[in-house]
Amino acid sequence: MTSFTNILLAVNATWLTLSVGVTIFLIITLVLVAILLVAKKYLVHSGDVEIDINNNKKITTASGKTLLATMSENGVFLSSACGGKGSCGQCKVQVFEGGGEILPTEQVHFSRKEQKEHWRLGCQVKVKEDMKIGIDPSVLDVKEWECEVISNKNVATFIKEFIVALPPGEHMNFIPGSYAQIKIPEFEMDYDKDIDKSLIGEEYLPAWNNYGLFGLKCKNTEPTIRAYSMANYPAEGDRIMLTVRIATPPFKPKPQVGFMDVMPGIASSYIFTLKPGDKVIMSGPYGDFHPIFDSKAEMMWIGGGAGMAPLRAQIMHMTKTLHTTDREMHYFYGARALNEVFYLEDFLNLEKEYPNFHFHLALDRPDPAADAAGVKYTPGFVHQVIYETYLKNHDAPEDIEYYMCGPGPMSKAVEGMLDSLGVDPSSIHYDNFG
């Protein structure tokens, strides 16, 4: 009996110890929760905050979101080609007060000098308190509209000319070479079912079938934003025209055939499904890739692929609107083959109308289709053609203004060629959205 009593006493003592321990743990937990709630109430701004922009515009807004999203909700549209993921580095603002310390994700986009000048990425800065920021004044002129698609046809095998109309009565003031942004909603699409084959065109459908593009599918799980250079120039009216290349997955390594199991580009897939009458959200204008108008220097445009867009806008404005005849102007465009070249007739007609404008077509290799059509071209990569046919015997390549937009490898090759000729980097102007 004594032994049993001792066991009961021991068990009771153990339970008492456990109960006391659990009680103390619960009390400590409740105290910590209370401290956190008090800290949140007094240290974290959960109500409205005031954002002072450029010392002359103030907005009162809710806290909690990124500065990029907060500004957009209040009608101030920062550029963000990556949709706020911190990779493009375009949503630059100066944060003079509020915003906390710069994050590692931001530091890669700024020099030490820029960091000392308070430059930040709007997509990485959380709005938690009153802020004082600085932005490019031109950003305040950016507008956002619901636009209507009026045309979306292929102009090359993998490139669409995408045109939308601004709402009635709306107008966008822009300088040729600017770009626009398009909002990409959540969607799920099947290339075979959701892309209108009549808008691809009979000329390009065989290539689409041969490459198996209609077997692709795409899904976007969250809204995002993408940037595209505008191909239109101001005199063409209240519309936005883009040239969009379909971003296919990489091909499988040889001898395999077909695409790798990677989703195609979200933005281009979405745009390729759009039909006349559809509505899209666009904003603009953005960018500083503009011609130098108060100059008499020779101008050379260098493009490839969908990089045609801003170069067409600049060239058409310099000729059709400004009627520039006192500057030598050359446009070198590179493509794999003739069926990848678009707006060819426009530039050939400009040559006839303006003796100071010259169009030069470079095709990667001899092209029987171009030969049969009587189209003048030079075989070779565009940087080689520029050097061999023009700059090699030019008196002063360093005095030319260069405007370039196209695939990365093309740009790198042109940069190297120009550097070998002593051209200063400041004479080379780029558009990063080709």
Model region roles, listed by residue range:
Residues L32-V38, V108-E170, D190:
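Fe-S ferredoxin-like electron-transfer domains
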Residues E148-P276, R336, A362-P366:
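Ferredoxin-reductase
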